[in-house]
Amino acid sequence: MLRLPDRWVWDFWIADTGSEYHIYFLQAPKSLGDQVKRHWNATVGHAVSANLRDWDVAGTALRPDPPGSWESMATWTGSVLEHDGLWHLLYTGTRSTDSGVEQRIALATSADLSTWTRHPSNPVIELDPRWYERVEHEAWRDPWLLRDPAGNGFHALITARATTGEPDARGVIGHAWSPDLVRWEVRPPLSEPGEFGHLEVPQVALVDGTPVLLFSVAPDRVGAARRARRPAEHSGPVVAVGESLLGPWDIAAARVIPVPDLYSARLVRDRAGEWQVLGFLDGSARGTFIGEISDPIPLRELGLP
């Protein structure tokens, strides 16, 4: 478990070198008092593990840029991918001049997974209103990086909202494509609206030959139609099965991972090749935010996908 005495930790992503797991996580000081303030004071922490359980904290990987920059308020969720001997990190940035409303996606690179350099072209992916809704608190965040299955460049899957459908169920998987991880083309969403308001922290993986989409849904982001259809279902991490890593996915039939307090879950293979689920422990639905990252949970024990 990753627990820090002076900081809350929440959303995270993992880079696997084959010998070590590097975890990057959002963190904010508990001295803020109110856990809601953590969102506007987030930096990206870094820790290293050999077994996904015991973590050596390695400091802060990214902080917001100085006042006046496009990412001057907080640095949010992303993902890491290695290409041509260099690690590439896509992450979400917000700025203080608009109180963090406008979310944009940026690129940083590293040779050693410790020291990160922001790309001069940042932000590299911005919302395209042809396909994605601009709302008071804009949904354009949490990019998940993957190589194109056919070898044609790279894809980013993004938490986004469609421009049509019931307002409480417009959440979709946004999509951008790149030939080189620097130049990005925003494309139409990879899923249809209709179930949730937001599909947060998406990830795709090929689990024993089955393409799986994993995302998380907050209690107030479950659409009314789905809530009426599944009144006993709680919110949290959700698993949907697809036809490929780029969809389509059967989100209407998606299943919630039945682990209390778990949120922003990730799928990771351990050294034995077994799929494990990790997530941060929330607890705010019960009145107390926890802010720790769980130990791994074997996916097969959860009966998923």
Regions from the PLM with identified roles:
Residues 1-305:
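Carbohydrate-active catalytic/glycan-binding domains of CAZyme proteins
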